[in-house]
From Swiss-Prot:
Family named by the database record: Belongs to the thioester dehydratase family. FabZ subfamily.
InterPro entries referenced in this protein's UniProt entry, alphabetically: FabA_FabZ (IPR013114), HotDog_dom_sf (IPR029069)
Keyword Acetylation: no
Coiled coil location: none
Protein name: Uncharacterized thioester dehydrase BH1850
Catalytic activity, EC: 4.2.1.-
Species the sequence originates in: Halalkalibacterium halodurans (strain ATCC BAA-125 / DSM 18197 / FERM 7344 / JCM 9153 / C-125) (Bacillus halodurans)
Active site: H55
The organism's place on the tree of life at top rank: Bacteria
GO molecular function, one term: lyase activity
Keywords tagged on the record: Lyase
Length: 156
């Protein structure tokens, strides 16, 4: 059986067409790499991101919860591609495990999230995510995410 993914270059896919989240809550700009077990996605942090004006005005940094959201969106994209699904699916983040933060994510930085699928149990998926700065590869955050994917509740 030939999959949809055999006919396209995944780096040309537009995350905004695959995810239900939309700006200003869409945090994946591009898919950089994909194979059967991993995906790498990027997010450029422009100086006019809405959250920078309040977190923190004198030293703006991306809030940790939004770094986790970026990781969750990248995890959902990996799962969708593994399922050969390009139409938006509803995913629910149900647990974060051992998420640690190591460096600041400041305006002008591009982040890369490398996601590896660890396990699938029914409609529950566990991923390992490492978020790095693309310029110096410094680790920004690392942890595991567990989410529920409602494959029956596809958005059409």
């Amino acid at each position: 059986m030939v999959s949809v993914l055999d006919k396209i270059n995944v780096t040309e896919l537009r995350p905004g067409n695959m995810l239900l989240q939309q700006p200003p809550f869409l945090f994946v700009d591009r898919i950089l790499e994909f194979d059967e077990e991993t995906i790498t996605c990027s997010k450029y942090l422009s100086h006019n991101e809405p959250f920078f004006s309040g977190h923190f005005p004198t030293q703006p940094i991306m809030p940790g919860v939004l770094i986790i959201e970026f990781a969750a969106q990248a995890s959902l994209l990996l799962t969708m591609l593994q399922l050969n699904e390009l139409e938006p699916l509803m995913g629910y983040l149900v647990k974060t495990e051992n998420f640690t933060f190591h460096a600041l994510a400041e305006p002008g930085t591009e982040l890369e999230a490398k996601v590896k699928m660890l396990k699938k149990m029914g409609n529950y998926y566990t991923t390992q995510v490492t978020v790095r700065r693309s310029d110096n590869k410094k680790k920004v955050a690392k942890g595991q995410l567990v989410f529920y994917l409602d494959e029956e509740g596809k958005e059409r």
